[in-house]
């Protein structure tokens, strides 16, 4: 048996986290999948890979020594051109890697980042491989909300050959798609969560009870008044129980530009740097509630039964909405309503019910890929 037939084209730490259970499932069958990395995000990539017991990327489609990650939309065209140019220049090498064991070549992409459609195009058009999309079929119903994620998903759906959809709703969204559509019953995030949920957590300096917030999407932070409104509501709420706001460098720069640093203190509304997944999830699981604009974190809250407000206008995952996970439509009054009622919103824990990565790996095995 050769070393590999499957390559993941990925670009963010979130993608690495969510494909980790699939990667390990394939490896358990005697193959060693490859990771080709677009460097859409590079912060803490090496640490995240080490946390997940995964190797360094086999190929950097943006040279590692010059990679700096995407921080603004204006950087996307140059990044995309670099990725495409390197994939084209190395096409013979990449094709050889995909076919070295004689099985059908396969590229896997994930989710809805810029890397998702670009990886699909590289796999299909440049490398002439079959392409599978993990977490396929999510739709918000609006190209503009969220932008660019909704567009990325739709482009990928037109290219790929296999769609691994996390629920019957996404399967239905793909009813006219070409290729194979597989219902994995849940997001692979639930499998990644099992790798992290019981890990150690540093609670030193934190209050016994706290809420936790992460707000980072372009559609929110680019709209100064909406971002200000959300942070002011959280600041006011933190006087009742402290709130920990996990902010990356772009959010901190935006807070500074809007003159909002004075909202935060070290007692009630506490700002902290983002944590790696294996450190963040155990912390989040101990929060009383979550306020986020992350679809992935909202799904994790659903699986944990942890009260969560999704501060977005629309969501591509309405199947997670209900008493536990609430969509605010980016309205301040709805966010406040959640904060007033979160104590009654704790739901059922689904952690042991779903195993989507097993379904994906078994499907790939049945199709002769592993």
Where in the sequence are the language-model features?
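Short N-terminal targeting/anchoring amphipathic segment
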Residues: 92-114
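N-terminal subdomain of nucleotide-sugar transferases
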Residues: 1-39
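A nucleotide-sugar donor-handling region in carbohydrate enzymes
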Residues: 36-38, 42-43, 156-224
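Conserved nucleotide-sugar phosphate-binding/catalytic loop shared by glycosyltransferases and other
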Residues: 31-86, 90
